[in-house]
């Protein structure tokens, strides 16, 4: 495993997980509004 690859991957994975977290949270709020 190349250390340069990790240096690139870590911020990308962090950004991706942050985006998924935010999208999921908003989607849950929308879903709760629809079901209530």
From Swiss-Prot:
It is a single-pass membrane protein. Residues 24-36 are stromal. One of its GO terms (molecular function) is manganese ion binding. The keyword Transcription does not apply. Keywords: Chloroplast, Membrane, Photosynthesis, Photosystem II, Plastid, Thylakoid, Transmembrane, Transmembrane helix. One of its GO terms (cellular component) is photosystem II. It is found in: Plastid, Chloroplast thylakoid membrane. It holds the Pfam family PsbY. PSII is composed of 1 copy each of membrane proteins PsbA, PsbB, PsbC, PsbD, PsbE, PsbF, PsbH, PsbI, PsbJ, PsbK, PsbL, PsbM, PsbT, PsbX, PsbY, PsbZ, Psb30/Ycf12, at least 3 peripheral proteins of the oxygen-evolving complex and a large number of cofactors. It forms dimeric complexes. Loosely associated component of the core of photosystem II (PSII), it is not always seen in crystals. PSII is a light-driven water plastoquinone oxidoreductase, using light energy to abstract electrons from H(2)O, generating a proton gradient subsequently used for ATP formation. This is Photosystem II reaction center protein Y. The gene is psbY.
């Amino acid at each position: 495993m190349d250390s340069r690859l990790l240096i690139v991957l870590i911020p990308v994975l962090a950004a991706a997980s942050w985006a998924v977290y935010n999208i999921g949270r908003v989607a849950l709020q929308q879903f709760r509004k629809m079901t209530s």
